[in-house]
Amino acid sequence: MRPTFTLGIEEEYQTIDPETRDLRSHIQTEMLAQGKLRLEERVKAEMHQSVIEVGTRICQNIEEAREDIYDLRRNMIHLAEENGLVLVAGATHPFADWRDQEIYPDPRYDKVVEDLQLVARSNLIFGLHVHVGIEDKEAAIQIMNSLRYFLPHILALSTNSPFWLGMETGYKSYRAKVFENFPRTNLPDSFGSYSEFENYVNLLIKTNCIDNAKKIWWDVRPHPYFDTVEVRVCDIPLRAEETVAIAALIQATACKLWKLHEGNMDYRQYSRALLMENKFRAVRYGLDGKLIDFGKESEVDERELIGEYLNFIDDVVPELGSRSAIDYIKTMLETGSGADRQLKVFRETGDLKMVVDYMAEETRAGLDL
């Protein structure tokens, strides 16, 4: 049975003090309560009090997803302003110190902090998660296996976290370095079947490693409760249009890989050890790096590889109705990722507060506010 390839998009935002430009907790405001009145369960708190998350409805195509995520951003920007805050889409804050940030009062987060201690408290990061509807569990596993190869390229496009604790880190996605301190992160191994994956999960639960499968935080996973493959590798991009383009790319990749699987032409599987080399390069250099073409056993400029990647998925784009969204990736290759643009502002101004101001402007871009 053909998957639906429906879409769900989650974004995590920063709540900022407009005077200091530092992170500020939204918990003393009505932002979350008002958000739930307007958006119901599409908005929720996250582990730190200066993080707020939104999620789209189940969307039938990328244009429906665009409409939903734009609407969510608009609403959250207005809610932040109404409560004396500024909303920012960035995967790390340029200078905020996690030690100054409080954990949101919730038993689930208390348990994570109890288990992971400093690693959890310092996890002050903001991501983008994209769900693609793949109802057949065996197909979901095969698509997850093959998607692993493309995740470094997807991450490179999304990179948006070059600063940490007021320092230029030298990484385009420092968020990825922070998050890999958690257990059960990074790229997963490949699995021969859904039952093999299920056995892995059951063993972890049986041996008290986890109490539920949502604590498997890989860069891609079959979602334990939804009939989706969830891609979790991305930094949250600055612009909503970048989020839509990346979601469209993930959807098209899943569709292409399913078609290959149906034709008994599964994409070649490379070892996790090799794929992690490319992930490191994406984390470190973003779009400016050279990633490894394992087939050719050579380094290739990332922008060139993404061009080849776009050619690879091009034949499924018309049926998904995602041409406009996919074409925007070419613009992203020209303008650079959010990390590139943050660094450019810092080079020009030498002022991280100006970087925060730029991030706030970009968060609003294209939303007709």
Task: Please describe what each predicted stretch is.
Residues 123-125, 138, 224-228:
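Coil-to-beta-strand transition motifs
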Residues 42-44, 80-93, 118-125:
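Short, flexible active-site-proximal loops enriched in glycine and acidic residues
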Residues 106-127:
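Acidic, His- and aromatic-enriched active-site or binding-groove loops in soluble protein domains
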Residues 106-113, 134-155, 238-251:
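Helical (often loop-to-helix) elements that flank the catalytic cores of nucleotide-handling enzymes
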Residues 130:
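An acidic/histidine-cluster motif and surrounding catalytic segment
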